[in-house]
């Protein structure tokens, strides 16, 4: 297996060389605009027609489903039409803190030991095995700044993001500011439950343009359009004389799901096909889930060992709905939650639209690499699970779009090769013409896929959550989840993209399971923990 991986790396180096040659032969340094979105599962835009997409269940009518996707994410679709979409992209860890720390430092969670949100600790302060492993890591903007790039950000890029120090200032950023705004008073929905908050923000006439995320995007768009913008005495300033790395962090659709009425009205609950059959399907999906994984879902077992409702946020929401209305209150609560999540996705999309408008109106569009990612996925009831914090695709698969102005042939293309957010760091450095600053950075340069989305790619995606011994490995066809107690899940992702049928231990996949296990061993060894 190591021989196959080495062959891939050698073979792809030729394509990388071609890509780098096109990027650096007499060209001015590339600008980077990075857009980060919190808790956005691949649900709208180009993903809506994937057979495993959650919208397929909520809106089984294709015409209506297309309309809903267009209401939800028209601007993200616009970016997809301009660049390449990675259809099988994964986070390094399905939680904000480890995912973002890994992406920004290039160091994998099973290597740093940061595999959970860890109480919100600042990533540089996190200690694993007696070592602050990320304390002196060079982040992507930090390294670019060292080599002459102007770096600036607003919004959530790192997990701790609303104050100066925990946004990694002044190491990562030349300039940083927290732009805040509100559409008005928040009115909770009667259907919200413990641990889950949603409702309407502002009065009925309030516009999404007043919301916090949109104002952040407007600020950054103004920087691009006019060359500068100021907030609270901090001025961002860009010019053609210096390459820049601008990062916009969009908080929605992270909880709480508060949205303005103009966006909530786009997703009437009457259009949703939420049924007890769907609920029962997700409950029964737990019949072959390893015991350890029950910690991550709303599943429990009765005395016979059959799956029943447990105590996840999702099942708590269902019970709260029944306390309001014993006649389908659980389904009504579910639909109401989805309405507010979808509207929150639309907030993120409108912010994306504003920053894309700003770039298109600026003099930098032809020389700016645009990267949009979500830090992880988000379960909305699958396996009776809600939020992230699991190694199933609902929580682990992400949005990942790249618009490379120097590879216009990739516009509208899709790549089904498995990739990871950990690959962004080496890709940006490759396109910037810089060597990697740290041997602990073990992601892969994605530029061959910019040139040819179907290029040979034998590197799997790998994720870790909860402990360095809980890992997922994903090829284009298969997936293995290995838990710290020895439990595992194996899925045929071509035949079973929703991960209903756990094949672990079955004779039909003995060889495949062994191959996946070997791939996982290689991935772990490649980025194993060391205090050196």
Language model: regions and residue ranges:
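A short beta-strand-to-alpha-helix junction
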Residues: 28, 64-73, 90-94, 129-137, ...
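A short aromatic-rich beta-strand->coil structural motif
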Residues: 32-40, 156, 245-248, 398-401, ...
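Long, internal low-complexity/basic segments
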Residues: 23-30, 37, 42, 85, ...
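C-terminal cap/loop subdomain of S1 sulfatases and analogous C-terminal strand-loop tails that border
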Residues: 219, 229-230, 376-382, 410, ...
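A long, amphipathic alpha-helix that forms part
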Residues: 214-232, 325-368, 523
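Histidine-centered active-site microenvironments of extracellular/periplasmic hydrolases
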Residues: 48-54, 357-413, 420
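Formylglycine-dependent
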Residues: 114-152, 157-264, 268, 319-332
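Active-site segment of extracytoplasmic enzymes that catalyze sulfate/phosphate-ester chemistry
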Residues: 41-138, 143-149, 163
């Amino acid at each position: 297996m190591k021989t196959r991986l080495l062959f891939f790396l050698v073979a792809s180096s030729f394509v990388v060389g071609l890509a780098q040659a096109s990027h650096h032969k007499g060209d001015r340094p590339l600008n980077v605009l990075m857009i980060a979105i919190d808790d956005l599962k691949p649900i709208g835009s180009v993903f809506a027609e994937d057979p495993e997409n959650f919208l397929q269940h909520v809106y089984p009518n294709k015409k209506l489903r297309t309309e809903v996707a267009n209401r939800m994410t028209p601007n993200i679709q616009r970016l997809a039409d301009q660049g390449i979409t990675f259809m099988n992209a994964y986070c390094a860890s399905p939680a904000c803190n480890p995912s973002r720390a890994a992406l920004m430092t290039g160091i994998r969670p099973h290597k740093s030991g940061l595999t959970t949100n860890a109480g919100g600790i600042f990533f540089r302060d996190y200690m694993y095995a007696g070592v602050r492993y990320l304390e002196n890591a060079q982040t992507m903007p930090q390294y670019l700044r060292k080599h002459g790039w102007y770096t600036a950000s607003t919004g959530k890029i790192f997990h701790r993001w609303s104050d100066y120090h925990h946004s990694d200032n002044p190491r990562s950023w030349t300039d940083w500011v927290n732009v805040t705004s509100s559409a008005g008073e928040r009115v909770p929905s009667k259907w919200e439950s413990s641990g889950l908050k949603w409702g309407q923000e502002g009065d009925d006439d309030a516009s999404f343009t007043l919301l916090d995320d949109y104002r952040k995007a407007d600020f950054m768009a103004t920087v691009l359009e006019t060359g500068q913008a100021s907030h609270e005495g901090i001025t961002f300033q860009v010019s053609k004389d210096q390459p820049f790395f601008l990062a916009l962090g969009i908080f929605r659709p992270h909880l709480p799901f508060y949205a303005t009425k103009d966006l909530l009205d786009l997703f009437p609950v009457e259009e949703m096909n939420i049924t007890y059959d769907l609920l029962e399907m997700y409950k029964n999906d737990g019949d072959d889930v390893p015991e350890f994984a029950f910690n991550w879902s709303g599943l429990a077992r009765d005395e016979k060992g059959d799956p029943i409702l447990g105590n996840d946020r999702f099942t708590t929401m269902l019970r709260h709905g029944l306390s309001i209305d014993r006649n389908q209150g659980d389904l009504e609560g579910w639909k109401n939650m989805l309405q507010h999540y979808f509207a929150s996705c639309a907030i993120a999309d409108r912010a994306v639209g504003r920053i894309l408008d700003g770039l298109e109106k600026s003099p930098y569009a032809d020389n700016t690499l645009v990267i949009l990612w979500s830090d992880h996925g988000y379960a909305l009831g699958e396996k009776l699970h809600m939020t992230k914090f699991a190694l199933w695709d609902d929580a682990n698969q992400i949005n990942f779009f790249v618009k490379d102005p120097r590879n216009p042939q990739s516009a509208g293309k899709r790549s089904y090769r498995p990739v990871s957010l950990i690959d962004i760091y080496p890709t940006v450095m490759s396109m910037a013409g810089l060597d990697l600053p740290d041997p602990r950075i073990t992601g892969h340069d994605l530029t061959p896929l910019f040139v040819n989305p179907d290029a040979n790619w034998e590197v799997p995606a790998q994720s870790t959550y909860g402990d360095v011994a809980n890992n997922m490995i994903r090829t284009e066809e298969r997936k293995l989840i290995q838990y710290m107690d020895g439990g595992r899940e194996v899925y045929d992702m071509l035949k079973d993209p929703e991960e209903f049928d756990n094949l672990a231990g079955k004779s039909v996949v003995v060889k495949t399971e062994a191959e996946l296990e070997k791939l996982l061993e290689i991935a772990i060894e490649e980025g194993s923990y060391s205090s050196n």
